[in-house]
């Protein structure tokens, strides 16, 4: 499934569904990662060829994460805490932002079967992207409707994600 939405003159939302890993995760994951890798590489190469790479940020997300422990079908089930991949000409790459939790069973953020409680909301990353993209501050509540539920320290500073020079 593919879905494309223009959110503003500077923000485009693009959705593609590649499949699921409830069954046979190890057998399917390498192929799925190769598909994602090839797609991200093709996108980056096209943006560079069009000389727009420095004004583009791509963020790869999921509406849910996967459990770290296998289910009965050698797959992985839905969970909460997950990761994002960001890339673009202005992105400060090669870093992990945030604190990666302990994956061992019984760890503070592991509530069982490898289901991790997130330590950051998606707004903590989307708000600095909106700032970088030049979204007016009056629209922040529309883009990140839960942002007032968190202290300012919850949000990743745009300077941690982007080269702002």
Model regions and ranges:
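Accessory "access/gating" subregions that flank catalytic or transport cores
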Residues: 1-20
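Feature marks hydrolase-like catalytic cores characterized by long aromatic- and Gly/Pro-rich stretches
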Residues: 17-165
């Amino acid at each position: 499934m593919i879905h494309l939405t223009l959110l503003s003159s500077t923000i485009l939302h693009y959705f593609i569904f590649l499949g699921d890993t409830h069954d046979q995760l190890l057998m399917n994951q390498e192929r799925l990662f190769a598909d994602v890798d090839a797609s991200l590489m093709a996108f980056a190469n096209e943006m560079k060829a069009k000389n727009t790479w420095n004004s583009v940020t791509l963020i790869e997300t999921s509406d849910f994460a996967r459990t770290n422990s296998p289910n009965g079908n050698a797959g992985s089930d839905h969970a909460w805490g997950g990761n994002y991949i960001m890339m673009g000409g202005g992105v400060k790459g090669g870093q992990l932002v945030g604190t990666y939790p302990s994956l061992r069973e019984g760890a503070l953020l592991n509530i069982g079967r490898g289901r991790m409680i997130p330590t950051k909301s998606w707004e903590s990353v989307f708000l600095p992207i909106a700032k970088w993209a030049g979204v007016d501050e009056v629209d922040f509540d529309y883009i990140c409707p839960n942002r007032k539920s968190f202290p300012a320290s919850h949000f990743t500073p745009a300077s941690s994600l982007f080269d702002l020079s």
